[in-house]
Curated annotation (Swiss-Prot):
GO CC annotation terms, alphabetical: cytoplasm
Recorded superkingdom: Eukaryota
Free-text function comment from the UniProt entry: Putative molecular chaperone that may promote the maturation, structural maintenance and proper regulation of specific target proteins.
Protein source organism: Pinus strobus
Protein name as catalogued: Putative heat shock protein PS1
Lineage, uppermost ranks: Eukaryota, Viridiplantae, Streptophyta, Embryophyta, Tracheophyta
Subunit structure: Homodimer.
Amino acid sequence: GVVDSNDLPLNVSELVSNASDALDKLSSSPCVLVSGKFWDNFGKTZTVEVEDDSAEAKTLSKFLNAALTDKTEEVVRNWKLMNAAELLSEINRLSSSEWQAALR
């Protein structure tokens, strides 16, 4: 769902935005109800994704999608526990191929 900024009060503080009719309607819409706890977690989650059409986008996107609901230290620790060696080899491969292309 998209909320038009004209429908929100000018002073969009947490209390005011929580009391807004537009947000109440959005939070009870069928698409939100279907997704379960999406609305509860919305706003606490930030997603980083690959925004490139290259063949490597799918490979890297599984590593770069991260819910940043934890403290930064916890996110970094979790990233290290993920297949870090595989991620680094992909990044090195991409970097070296792009570097070689740049030298041509």
